[in-house]
A protein has these predicted regions:
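Intrinsically disordered, low-complexity repeat regions of secreted/extracellular protein precursors
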Residues: 70-418
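Low-complexity/repetitive intrinsically disordered segments
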Residues: 420-422
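Terminal amphipathic alpha-helical/low-complexity segments used for targeting or macromolecular assembly
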Residues: 1-66
Length: 422
């Protein structure tokens, strides 16, 4: 018992021993009656030697006498700010307001921690970084260059916030994520995993960027949108609402992915294209130009939707099919294989265009009609009902192929002819 009391008394004495003093002959006047005092070590501790000069504090409450915490160089700790634990503040760094630097954290260079902000654990703030308001920088996180973390934002784990980046609002950057350049992460946004947000990109609202995803350039991810996997959103692209871009998908240029849309696999959406509604674009599909894929439409495989084309409803464009120019595919229609729909052509209802077929001009294919093989329907021709155009057949002019008619082989139907069948 005696030994235990002796040890306890020793620890108490050690904890109350002052490790530094305030020098009254080396001060800085800040105005408003505030004086800062340089500190001098009274004992050796950590890497600090007895007699070593430190930085400046306003009062002893700014730097804890226990632990190895230290302020050195021309660093300043003022107001109700605290440096505790084994934390280090040095260079020209400033810790002000009611801020706290604790644990093994370091605040270096011209960095500033102010207001009610806290830098803890093994976190680092250096360069011209600023951590303010109620922000938290924890774990092994680093905030540096001219980066700023403010409001209620958090940066944790091994995350990095660099360059001129800002993390604001209730945003959280964690894991091994990077936010750099002039990027902004705000609102309730989360950037996690190995994600990268750079350039002038923005991640806002309740958006999530995670995995190995990259959001760069002037891209904007907002709403409840998700960018995950190895996906890339670049240029002036926008992903919003509850849309998701994942896998190895890329959305770039001025493209938009909105609504409940899903772009995944190796799909690419570029130029001024728009994928919206509950549409899905996946596989190796590409949506480019001013094309629009919306509703519950699916574009997949190696399909291409380009120009001013529109794919809507529950339509499907798949295989190596192409829908281009001002063409429209809608309702439950399907364009598949190596088929092509171009110009002002329309494919609707439950119609199918497949094989190497080509529907062009102002042609219309609808009902449960089928155009397949190497068939070609063009000009103002209409193929509808249960009609079929197959083989190497050609249908053009103002022709109507209707009923159960079957135009096949090398047949050619033109002018104002109407072909019907029972």
């Amino acid at each position: 018992m005696a030994n235990e009391l002796k040890q306890a008394r020793g620890k108490l004495e050690q904890s109350t021993v002052k490790k530094y003093e305030l020098l009254t002959n080396d001060t800085i006047e800040l105005g408003g009656g505030i004086t800062l005092f340089r500190i001098k070590a009274l004992i050796s501790f950590g890497n600090v030697k007895k007699g070593e000069l430190g930085g400046y504090v306003e009062k002893e409450g700014n730097l804890c006498h226990s632990g190895d915490a230290w302020v050195t160089g021309d660093a300043r700790v003022t107001g109700d700010a605290k440096v505790t634990g084994n934390a280090k503040v040095y260079g020209n760094a400033k810790v002000t307001g009611s801020a706290e630097v604790t644990g093994n954290a370091k605040v270096v260079g011209n960095a500033e921690v102010c207001d009610n902000a806290k830098v803890s654990d093994n976190a680092r703030a250096f360069g011209n970084a600023k951590v303010s308001d109620n922000a938290r920088v924890t774990g092994n996180a680093k905030v540096y260059d001219n980066a700023e973390v403010c409001d209620n934002a958090k940066v944790s784990d091994d995350a990095r916030v660099t360059g001129n980046a800002r993390v604001t609002g209730d945003a959280w950057v964690s894991d091994d994520a990077w936010v750099t350049g002039d990027a902004r992460v705000t609102g309730n946004a989360r950037v996690t995993g190995d994600a990268w947000v750079s350039g002038d990109a923005k991640v806002s609202d309740d958006a999530r960027v995670t995995g190995d995803a990259k959001v760069t350039g002037d891209a904007w991810v907002s709403g409840n949108a998700r960018v995950t996997g190895k996906a890339k959103v670049t240029g002036n692209a926008k992903v919003s609402d509850i849309a998701e871009v994942t896998g190895n998908a890329k959305v770039y240029d001025n493209a938009k992915v909105t609504g409940d849309a899903w772009v995944y696999g190796n799909a690419k959406v570029s130029d001024d294209a728009w994928v919206s509604g509950s549409a899905e674009v996946y596989g190796n599909a590409k949506v480019t130009g001013n094309a629009w894929v919306t509703g519950n439409a699916w574009v997949y495989g190696n399909a291409r939707v380009t120009g001013n084309a529109k794919v809507t409803g529950r339509a499907k464009v798949t295989g190596d099919a192409k829908v281009t120019d001002n063409a429209k595919v809608y309702d439950n229609a399907e364009v598949t294989g190596d088929a092509k729909v171009s110009d002002n052509a329309k494919v609707s209802d439950n119609a199918t265009v497949s094989g190497n077929a080509w529907v062009s001009g102002n042609a219309k294919v609808y009902g449960i009609a089928k155009v397949t093989d190497n068939a070609w329907v063009t000009d103002d021709a209409w193929v509808f009902d249960n009609a079929k155009v197959t083989g190497n057949a050609r249908v053009f002019g103002y022709t109507n192929i209707t009923g159960n008619a079957n135009v096949t082989d090398n047949a050619k139907v033109s002018d104002n002819v109407k072909v019907t069948g029972r």
